[in-house]
Amino acid sequence: MTDMWKTEGMAAVGAPMDRVEGRLKVTGGARYSAEMPVANVQHAVIVQSTVANARITSIDTATAEKLPGVVRVLTHHNMPKLSPQAGKPPASRFLTLLQDDIVYYNGQPIALVIADTLEHATDAAHRVTAKYASARPVTDMRASNRVSYAPESNGRKPDSTKGSVSAGLADADVRIAATYTTPIENHNPMEPHATIAAWEGDKLTVYDATQYVIGDRNTVAKTLGLSPDDVRLVSYFIGGGFGCKGSVWSHVPLAAMAAREIGKPVKLVLTRRQMYGPVGARPETEQKITLGAKRDGTLTAVRHDSVSHTSRFEDFLEPSAMQTRMLYASPNIETSHRLVKLDLGTPTYQRAPGEATGTFALESAMDELAEALHMDPLALRLKNYAEVDPDSGKPWSSKSLRECYRTGSERFGWSKRSATPGSMRDGDVAIGYGMATATYPTNRQKASALVRLTGDGRGGVRALVQTASQDIGTGTYTVMTQVAADALGLSVEQVRVEIGDSRMPPSPVSGGSMTAASTGSAIDVVCRQARSELAAQGVTDLTSMGAYLDRQPDRSLTVRADSAPGEDARKYSMHSFGAVFVEVRVDRELGEIRVPRVVASYGAGRILNAKTAHSQLIGGVVWGLGMALEEETLVDPRTARYMNADLAEYHVPVNADVGTLDLSFVEEHDPYVNPIGVKGIGEIGITGVAAAIANAVYNATGVRVRDLPITLDKVMEKTRV
């Protein structure tokens, strides 16, 4: 037998292992929330408002209620009242729907139809009519009469001041100031939001497509006035989330309340169009960057002022200026965040919230400063490389950004770039090179896990690991299997990981790129603790391990443990970094922009699975391409209606839009970040990409586009070449 304690080489961790649930998914065996086998389930369909900023004066459900198969139609007139705690922080006021006649945004649920089939429920929903007393909605964040305000701090202060930017600008030889905008963007996961709610007495089971099993359970319990112990939340497989499934939206408690009202399970699945408005989006931003520098490129002043929109009824802040506080060394850095209320649904987190939008502005401005200084953009960034965190003054737990710059620039061929806009051509096609810095914080929260080692009666051993985490398509099942196998000294074939059930030990949200760091650390800790307990009993190898377990009354050993950030989290600043280089080709006659290649290099700590990690980078970079060139949610200013609320008119990149992606990691060892040395890579891939493309478009055409997306009309309107 293999020595149980021999972990040199760590064959399980780091290997490009295929997804353990892959066969289930491709054969249809993986059951998503809408597919869970629940007997006698009834179907619910939401009726949405057609206006915003209004009150319902009347709502007619009589015709719908008479249709075949209709069980109930719920409105604010007959919906049971929620718990007084519903909608209070940290929960959203989105959850208090069908409680009164107020309509905040177009598409807000105003009724819920329950019927025996989806077809019957859909037909009846179309027969519900409402009348409103409405005022013209406010949808333009950049209106001249807008009122902006500083949101209350929820852990991160909206404003920051280091030194004096005014003094730094006075000391500068070169100054630039520019305003950059990003539009509303929607998540568009392949799987829409879906919920099945089933009661058994006073106990509630909810199958929901969620990024946060424990948080979802707690919010549902609070909203309905239940104990969390009386709510079971299950989410075994999720078809993408990207942030919109990290919060509980109104459809979840609506399904639960409907099920309680009719005494039968209720299934509620949103349509694609219903994914626009009721479940959040990335908010619009307007960001002003002011930079000052000496002739040699030394930054003397950095200012980043960001404004984003929120809903009329609650605050959500897009923290676009956060990375500006820590990315470049300068004695004078000031940032601010302001909100503007609009008659739209509340925005929410979307892949790299803050950093995705913020790096577009900051990294575009850095290139504009480089142009004003007649300096290479990469050289400017290296000139202002931050050896410590400029915001906190703390040392980095690790930082490999210099190596990322070197590796990325060499693989890309950055030295061949011509600094003169429009000078690189291939016939009627203008070629441009651009680059940007990528960054994302390393987040970690407390997590718990359980391991049960079982003997098979013949000296063999199997391990079951449980934690209430969730796999949103990132490979959590697979990576956690590798972590457990490595910590136990077992093969991956001997390990089974179970997640997605609130009855398991709690884990945090799958967001903020923290699952590997949080849940992975908990699994590593509990498995090593189990190994230590076995060692105390004289177990020295797999043979003695199996024999020991076979002698136990139930042939097993069960251990549960927690893992949480410690003192190192207070001593060090923890971030992932990367460098993105892109080539664009712009048709000089048509303005069409193509991105034939992206080369990017990242330093993100220990890589747990080379294949899933590379997959995450591909996804992030493709998201960056969409952000730069295609994605924009359009709102009708007259009605506040989303005008392109489907995948036909909301444009996202397809295979034909994506060129060669050369994405790599530099080796990075971080002994301080967490027990397994990982930083998380789910979001860094999108950061910097939009700016690199904008910078490349300028290099190709001489046109500086500061308003995303960069569409051909914006290029043709100002083209100089």
Regions found by a protein language model. Give the residues of each.
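Extended active-site and interfacial segments that coordinate phosphate-rich ligands
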Residues: V20-L24, H126-P137, Q211, N218, ...
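Helix-loop-helix junctions that connect adjacent transmembrane helices in secondary transporters/permeases
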Residues: R146-L224, Y385-R462, R641-F665
